[in-house]
Amino acid sequence: GMGDSRIEVLKGIDLEIERGEFCVLLGPSGSGKSTLLNIIGGIDGADSGSITIDGERIEDMTEKKLSLYRRKHLGYIFQMYNLIPNLTVRENIEVGAYLSDKPLDVDELLHTLGIYEHQRKLPNQLSGGQQQRTAIGRAIVKNPDILLCDEPTGALDYNTGKSILKLLQNMCREKGMTVIIITHNQALAPMADRLIHIKNGQVARMESNENPTSIDEIEW
């Protein structure tokens, strides 16, 4: 029956990302970028192949270990901001901090994100951009080893988007965080240490960039 038809989203993807790199996965929508991010994040399983982080294969981890890996080592920024509706901006970010044994300073982060003066508001009292910044704060406050971002500036105006990317670039540089961003915005390519072009579920090509451009110098 129809139920058996399987669509292969990713085929023979082979890539390596170094610790502390700012990596951009570039490709049109529907090219399999989000699926790849979910597999790295341990949210989706791959039917075959393996993902190794720090020498450990994700598919060999027990449920308990996988959930610990996600909680302690991963930050995840989705296009949809799944904020907890009955918690304030500050409390939403503190939820992220509780999960970590090395969290960033919440006040400092609220300032950096430009939402310090909105910290007592509930999500439904915020603009889309403020909600997105709160969601980003919750992911970053954990001070994760790996930060996965799915079109992190998708819903943001140009300046807010730029300030968020600057924050992500700084986190990568200052904290040695591995940041993986998926986007269809070609303009972001020069800011990456590593640029991975994804096309029809495959790595079309991979480029390393010795001298990444600061986001300040990028226009789109």
Predicted features along the sequence, with ranges:
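ABC family nucleotide-binding domain
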Residues: G1-M191, H197
